[in-house]
Amino acid sequence: MTENFGFTACRQLLQMFLAVIFFHCSEFVLVIAIHGKNNVTLRSLLISKNYALAMTCSLLEYFVEIYLFPGMKEHWVISNTGLVMVIVGETIRKLAIITAGRSFTHLIRRYPNDQHKLVTHGIYKYIRHPSYCGFLIWSVGTQIMLCNPVSTLAFAAIVWRFFKERIPYEEFFLRQFFGSGYEEYARRTNSGIPFIK
């Protein structure tokens, strides 16, 4: 099995671990920078049981496939496409967080507060939910980077379904808070998630 863990496997796994570590640490640091360390909990790391299970399954797929079909992981063009997706997704998400500033939270606000503003400039001018768009691209990109066909499809379907349920729920409150301003914004701006209006 050690002959299967050549340069490509080491590179792909290192990129995956660095992508995951950077994603979570940068989210945590941004939450502290924007909201102050008194408003930060371990939930700010965005690691849930379902997320940990998904990542574990993706690594399991990787190791099974590299053992049974080592050539399957040698598609550099596919792997590098995934790496580009990870970088693009990460960039879109972080631009969303920085642009929204104190209006950005990881939890859906159900009650308005003075710091919550309707953000329609920057990346929000083009994408209504850029943090979700970025996460979808990032998460699917991690699996393409590993040349994991099963996890690529599973991550795409599961993350898409999560946002299909979350976006209408979140937008219910945004319409309550911002009224016709949000209606007009939603009408002219794409959600950023395929097939979700």
Predicted regions and their residues:
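Histidine-centered phosphotransfer motif of kinases
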Residues: 120-121, 125-133
